[in-house]
Amino acid sequence: LCDKILKENNITPIGFDDWWKKWWKHHFEDTSMEYVLLPWEGSRHNPIGHADGIVRYVDQGRVLLTNYADLDPEHARLLKERLQAKGFEVEELSYLPYFDPKQDNTFRSLFDHTWCYINFLQVRTHLLVPQLGYPELDREAVRQIKVVYHKSGIHCQVHPINLDMSPIVIMDKKNNGGGALNCLTW
């Protein structure tokens, strides 16, 4: 969860924790679940403030973080610290080693929307990865996601969705825009 939930609901972290425990016990009485409140920077890098545009659970003890280190290194550090404090090994996507926003106009225009790759849809062993319509960048995102899942020993197929998602990804409050593939499913 993003700590944006605290502001939107005018609740303190302690108040939220109390509510969460009661809600969880009421709905799933014989199980337990721990949550992580991720800091939301509230900027253009994740305008919606949903965790599925920031991080992806890969497997027990491992998560995949979007390319915040490319966008906002200090915020990436805060996210990693919060996740590592909860015992997660953090893998990260990164595109700056491969693309230069100062030299590449297409990449520069899409740079703030690269978070969309983490917002892929998982259906059992199939990962459906959104695309931004820039083939080199789209391929690099798919490659990195494959590497992380393979490294984790998870056998899955990664499918790039052959559809330019940028009209959906780019925030448009008038038309309820923003989000990516995973967001569209709920």
Predicted regions and their residues:
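Histidine/cysteine-enriched polar flanking segments
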Residues: 1-186
